[in-house]
Amino acid sequence: MSGKIGLYTGSFDPVTNGHMDMIKRASHLFEHVYVGIFNNPNKQSFFTFELRAQMLSEAVCALPNVTVVSAEHGLAVDLARELSVTHLIRGLRNTADFDYEIGLEYFNHRLAPDIETIYLMATHDLQPVSSSRIRELIAFRAPITGLVPQAVINQVEKMNENNKKN
């Protein structure tokens, strides 16, 4: 897809190996991929915005055509226009994701008809992985190895060490 620029967005609270799979696959399809980290106004964040951006940046650092951009507030289509993005990239794990994305795509297309949306299906073994499930595991200090990038594991270990000291 020469000349095509993608934008993959999320709250990444925290970034998971499911997200990373989407980002890596998109990096092979697009000349450049921006990963936009947003706050979800409907959710209470587990990690701070800055920490989520840091973990995500560390996780994608080996991908030369991927750039993390912070957009704490606003719409993905506004960021897409600002970055001259040609495609919004969305990941689908299941039919619930699909149903949600249909409504989102309708409004994205109304707001930015020149920006296409493409969907990537989650790899089968990563379909159950979600940030909310990872947060549950973290809260119970259950192992998250194999489910998240090393940057997240490092941060969780650091948090656990700090909690032991307090």
Swiss-Prot record:
Binding annotation for ATP: S11, F12, H19, G91, L92, R93, E101, L126, Q127, P128, V129, S130, S131, S132
Species whose genome carries this gene: Streptococcus equi subsp. equi (strain 4047)
Record-given protein name: Phosphopantetheine adenylyltransferase
GO biological process, alphabetically ordered: coenzyme A biosynthetic process
Alphabetized UniProt keyword annotations: ATP-binding, Coenzyme A biosynthesis, Cytoplasm, Magnesium, Nucleotide-binding, Nucleotidyltransferase, Transferase
InterPro entries attached to this UniProt entry: Cyt_trans-like (IPR004821), PPAT (IPR001980), Rossmann-like_a/b/a_fold (IPR014729)
Binding-site positions, substrate: S11, K43, A76, R90
Cofactor: Mg(2+)
Annotated site (Transition state stabilizer): H19
Compartmental location: Cytoplasm
Alphabetical list of HAMAP family matching this protein: PPAT_bact
Gene Ontology, cellular component aspect: cytoplasm
A Pfam family annotated for this UniProt entry: CTP_transf_like
Keyword flag Cytoplasm: yes
Molecular function per GO: ATP binding; pantetheine-phosphate adenylyltransferase activity
Stated family: Belongs to the bacterial CoaD family.
Main location: cytoplasm
Annotated catalysed reactions: (R)-4'-phosphopantetheine + ATP + H(+) = 3'-dephospho-CoA + diphosphate
The keyword Acyltransferase appears for this protein: no
